């Protein structure tokens, strides 16, 4: 796609975000299967359903813009997925939950950056309804990041306590 205009560039990035959400929907299931702790599995399962809605919100954004869904690639998520899978394979089983949370945290940071940029550009285009849908996605991703951080801190504290015991 030629992205020589701001609207075309926005559509490209919106399409990339759509592919990001579709890929993360798959990845979250894999992370859930890799995780050991029930609270991590549950959080990943819940966010997976939110991720499904994120993709549908983006589809609705394209409809509001009167455009077909742009099928732009999202190489960042592809690379993060490869890295996460390789790291999980090489990690001692007792540390897998921590690695799963690291992967979740990294992807949430990326998603937050994507949505913040898209929202700014949607407002610049005067596409208020589009910005509102993207804001819903952003809010859920910020919450997912907080859940991952909190759980990661709990695991770290438990690990330190076990080491000091």
Where are these regions (language model features)?
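Amphipathic alpha-helical hairpins
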Residues: 1-165
């Amino acid at each position: 796609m030629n992205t020589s205009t701001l609207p075309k560039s926005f559509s490209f990035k919106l399409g990339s975000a759509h592919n990001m959400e579709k890929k993360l929907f798959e990845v979250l299931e894999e992370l859930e299967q890799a995780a050991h702790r029930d609270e991590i599995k549950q959080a990943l399962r819940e966010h997976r359903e939110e991720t499904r809605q994120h993709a549908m919100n983006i589809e609705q954004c394209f409809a509001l813009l009167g455009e077909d869904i742009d099928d732009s690639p999202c190489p960042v998520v592809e690379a993060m997925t490869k890295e996460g899978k390789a790291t999980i394979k090489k990690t001692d089983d007792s540390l897998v939950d921590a690695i799963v949370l690291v992967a979740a945290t990294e992807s949430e940071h990326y998603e937050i950056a994507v949505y913040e940029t898209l929202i700014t550009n949607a407002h610049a285009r005067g596409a208020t309804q589009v910005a509102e849908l993207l804001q819903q996605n952003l809010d859920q991703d910020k919450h997912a990041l907080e859940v991952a951080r909190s759980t990661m801190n709990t695991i770290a504290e438990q690990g330190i306590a076990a080491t000091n015991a």
